[in-house]
């Protein structure tokens, strides 16, 4: 199967956001309940490698669920590591064979083409999470928004345990990114509370 989309725009956006995170922002809250910027960056370190392995199929039969809670350590080289892993993930999904058959990530087996969309969703939505938590604005390619809207349009309003919270109602005429965020259980108006 030929690649259905390219990860470069989403990867480039996430790298720019990660590059702009400052050390004093690591303890800031994020839209992910109970997760700080540090926690979310540690999650991104893990997911970028997991989805690269899903593309190469090296994870098949040996992937495991991500650690529960927010106990994953953040490596000292998180900034350069995330950038490097996003580059290799992008390259891995450019290989036509990556899109064939089934694959695994995080202990979940899916058709490879569906796994690619899950990876795109994770990269795109967590880029927004990190951006809004650190006072930035993410850039999302219109083509990526269209892919993710189609993927998520049948989301259960009650959410998907372990993945998405209950859908947040967003006006039909809201920007496409806001409508996508609502489907993932996020409030597009979320902002960190002002320091006391």
Task: Give the role of each language-model region.
Residues 2-6, 10-13, 20-33, 50-196:
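Structured surface interface patches that mediate subunit assembly and partner/cofactor docking
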Residues 40:
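Extended, alpha-helix-rich binding/interface surfaces that flank or overlap catalytic cores
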């Amino acid at each position: 199967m030929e690649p259905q989309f390219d990860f470069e725009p989403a990867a480039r956006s996430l790298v720019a956001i990660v590059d702009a995170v400052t050390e004093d922002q690591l303890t800031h809250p994020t839209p992910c309940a109970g997760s700080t910027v540090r926690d979310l960056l540690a999650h991104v370190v893990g997911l970028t490698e997991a989805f690269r392995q899903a593309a190469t199929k090296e994870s098949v039969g040996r992937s495991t669920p991500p650690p529960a809670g927010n106990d994953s350590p953040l490596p000292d080289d998180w900034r350069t590591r995330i950038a490097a892993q996003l580059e290799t993930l992008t390259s891995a999904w450019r290989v036509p064979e990556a899109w064939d058959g089934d694959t695994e990530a995080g202990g979940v087996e899916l058709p490879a083409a569906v796994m690619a969309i899950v990876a795109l969703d994770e990269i795109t939505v967590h880029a927004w999470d990190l951006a809004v938590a650190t006072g930035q604005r993410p850039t999302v390619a219109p083509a990526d928004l269209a892919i993710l809207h189609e993927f998520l349009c049948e989301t259960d309003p009650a959410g998907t345990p372990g993945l998405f919270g209950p859908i947040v109602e967003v006006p039909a005429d809201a920007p496409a990114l806001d409508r996508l965020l609502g489907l993932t259980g996020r409030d597009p108006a979320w902002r960190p509370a002002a320091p006391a």
